[in-house]
Amino acid sequence: MKIIKKVLLGMFMLLAFTSCSLLFPDSGPSVTHVSSVSPFTKSQKSVYIEGATVGVEKAIKSRLTQRNWRVSTEDTGNETFAIVFDQLNIDSYEDGGFINTTYHEFTGYVSIFDTRNGERLYVYDFTKQSLDGVLAGIEKGMSEVEKSMR
């Protein structure tokens, strides 16, 4: 009887540990810090996007505009920061179900630069992410940049 209790207790503990790991997944995208951000003012809160497709540019512009960033799709020389897609690969595949749906997976890495001194601030390396996953990583990097705003 004691053996059965120990086996059941072991199974219960295994179930408890696996369910806890499902309840608390990782906290989101991992953005690598490269160098410190020089302080900037609200009037300098501007960024341009380079190396992204038109659809990705529009999505980033929409998200950052909601966070009160001035966003440009080309370098005019007035921007304080730059979001540069050093590499961006898009894989498309179709769901062969009743309603045909096309999915896109993004792989690559994007850097956030300070255009005032040319320093790379953050790097986000992503593999097989949806567009929302890529945007979440960029937003996380830009929120880290915002912490240096005076």
Task: Place the predicted regions along the sequence by residue.
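Conserved beta-strand termini and adjacent loop/short-helix elements that scaffold enzyme active sites
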Residues: S72-T76
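Surface-exposed short loop/turn segments
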Residues: Q66-R67, G77-K128, D132
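C-terminal partner/receptor-binding element of secreted or periplasmic proteins
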Residues: L121-R150
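Bacterial N-terminal signal peptides
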Residues: G10-S19
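A structural "domain/chain start" motif
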Residues: I3, T18-R70, R150
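Repeat-unit-sized solenoid/scaffold elements
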Residues: G28, N78-A82, M142-R150
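Bacterial N-terminal signal peptides that target proteins for export
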Residues: M1-L8
